[in-house]
């Protein structure tokens, strides 16, 4: 049986592990976090990505985890409602659409559950070195003993360790978009009822939306700065920057900054894209944000990750023992769709205007997935 190690147990990694296992691979998953990484924003599964969930037998379960958000309010700095929208929301788009909006960690839990019977998980560990001799890849880990695998899949996100080890430094491939954003869990102190509330200040944005049947909420804070560089691992520097920029901008920012410091799942990063001419080298391939991050601003990151995992595993199956052909066909089948979805980020649109919904839907549905 062919062996593969997948690095990164988020959406792309767990989906790839599922499909590789289903297609006959012995799969090992390595994840730096001690368990599944908690938290994350509301994410969307759209168009053909819904077909991927259905083929995994997870569509009904994903629908059960929908946020069921009914709409959004937009307020001034004193909390007075300026207007409300019951047709679409900033996080999920049209309210009455076939798309599924759910929390990131809920989707990952579903994917993890689907892989558990057949996938070996190495939590609290990471790949240290990769040595591809043409016949196999020798992988050393920070904790586990070194092993050899037929293939290595990097699904370890925007700041991919596998990409760095095989292709080189992140700066070669990253396109920074200038928006810095934080997301974290807070109590539902606004008593939101399947609802979102947003305030746009002069230079910052803050939003809160209810989660888990109104028992808690997610907070989002964001600002624009094309010159700022903060290490994505330096939480204290992130806290300080958010405090400096947000404290005077009104609404409930003071409460959010208070909750921020004790949140169990605080996440902060600059919105970025990863642009690569190729997603594989030798016996190593990338999937999801590691190879072609669209950024959360595209609204398509999760769907692209699910589709990429499905197509990567499917093309490897179709190619039999010829992994090079499988990797090449994965790129040929998918790179056009990736490019169209990366184009969705508004800095590509004249004047930064929102993309018309019709054009967005055209791009979402601009791929037909095969039966592998």
Swiss-Prot record:
Gene Ontology molecular function, alphabetical: FAD binding
Gene3D superfamilies for the chain: D-Amino Acid Oxidase, subunit A, domain 2, FAD/NAD(P)-binding domain
Record-linked PANTHER family: MONOOXYGENASE, OXIDOREDUCTASE-RELATED
Protein's name according to its UniProt entry: Uncharacterized protein MT1298
Lineage of producing organism: Bacteria, Bacillati, Actinomycetota, Actinomycetes, Mycobacteriales
């Amino acid at each position: 049986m062919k062996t593969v190690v997948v690095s990164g147990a988020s959406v792309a990694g767990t989906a790839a592990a599922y499909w590789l296992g289903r297609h006959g691979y012995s799969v090992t998953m390595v994840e730096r976090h001690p368990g599944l990484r908690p938290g994350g924003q509301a994410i969307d599964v759209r168009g053909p990505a819904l077909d991927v969930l259905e083929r995994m037998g997870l569509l009904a379960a994903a629908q059960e985890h929908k946020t069921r958000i009914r709409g959004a309010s937009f307020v001034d700095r004193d909390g007075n409602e300026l207007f409300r929208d019951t047709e679409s929301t900033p996080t999920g788009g049209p309210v009455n659409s076939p798309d599924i909006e759910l929390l990131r960690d809920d989707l990952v839990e579903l994917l993890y559950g689907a892989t558990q019977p057949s996938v070996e998980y190495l939590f609290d560990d990471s790949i240290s070195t990769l040595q591809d001799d043409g016949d196999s890849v020798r992988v050393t880990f920070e904790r586990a003993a070194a092993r050899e695998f037929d293939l290595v899949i990097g699904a370890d996100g925007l700041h991919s360790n596998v990409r760095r080890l095989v292709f080189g430094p992140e700066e070669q491939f990253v396109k920074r978009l200038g928006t810095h954003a934080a997301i974290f869990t807070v109590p539902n102190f606004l008593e939101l009822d399947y609802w979102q509330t947003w305030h746009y200040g002069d230079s910052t944005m803050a939003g809160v939306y209810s989660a888990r049947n109104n028992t808690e909420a997610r907070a989002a804070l964001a600002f624009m700065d094309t010159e700022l560089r903060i290490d994505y691992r330096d939480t204290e520097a992130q806290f300080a920057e958010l405090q400096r920029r947000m404290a005077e901008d009104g609404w409930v920012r003071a409460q959010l900054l208070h909750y921020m410091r004790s949140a169990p799942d605080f996440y902060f990063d600059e919105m970025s894209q990863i642009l690569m001419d190729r997603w594989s080298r030798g016996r190593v391939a990338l999937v999801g944000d590691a190879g072609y991050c669209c950024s959360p601003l595209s609204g398509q990151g999760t769907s692209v990750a699910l589709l990429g995992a499905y197509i990567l595993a499917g093309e490897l199956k179709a190619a039999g023992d010829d992994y090079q052909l499988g990797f090449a066909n994965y790129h040929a089948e998918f790179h056009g769709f990736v490019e169209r979805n990366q184009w969705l980020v508004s800095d590509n649109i004249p004047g930064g205007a929102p993309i018309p919904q019709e054009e967005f839907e055209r791009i979402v549905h601009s791929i037909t997935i095969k039966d592998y």
